[in-house]
């Protein structure tokens, strides 16, 4: 289980990076973020209400809104500067609303057909996050988590380590991203989020499946009621 210190990294990593996030996540994943978001969307077959946790600048939130134009989509994030960008970039959507809140602590009156979270799991306590998601899920609802994983294949892991080292070097030249690009590789290497969340989802009565993406550089975990 990750400690509270992992969650405390969020403001250190992201408070000053909202306006540049979209570009950095594209180049920082070698363009794979768009592919990963597409794979997340493929896990969503239908629904009238969606909750996107750690929505950031609203990249995934807007993609869900585009796929389900008649649905209600709520995005939650703990960082105000990111929500400011999300709201600005989502002006053309009338079915999206954003809330400043903590993914582990939010309480809403609504329940949702699907709850998504990309790049969030490694920062949270699995027991707390899953319990809160289940409490906001409809009877036939589905949870979809996505995050980085540390590749198991030695050859792929070698390339991944090289790329993470490159990101650390890049971070030294971008002041606002220095903490994130230096700290994230360490967090990714030590995180066992996929195993932890799989166990907790199963204990909460969810049907669990997972899918590795890009040779194990990230993964999608689903839990369905």
Task: Identify the function of each model-found stretch.
Residues 1-20:
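N-terminal, positively charged/glycine-rich alpha-helical extensions of SAM-dependent methyltransferases
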Residues 8, 149-200:
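C-terminal alpha-helical "lid/dimerization" subdomain adjacent to the S-adenosyl-L-methionine
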Residues 30-47:
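Conserved alpha-helix/loop element of class I SAM-dependent methyltransferases that forms part
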Residues 51-105:
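Class I SAM-dependent methyltransferase SAM/SAH-binding core
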Residues 104-115:
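A short acidic, Gly/Pro-enriched loop at the edge of an enzyme's catalytic core
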Residues 114-127:
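A short SAM/SAH-binding and catalytic strip from SAM-dependent methyltransferases
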Residues 128-139:
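A short glycine-rich, Lys/Arg-flanked "PGG" loop and its adjoining helix->strand segment in the class I
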Residues 141-148:
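Conserved beta-strand signature within the Rossmann-like core of class I S-adenosyl-L-methionine
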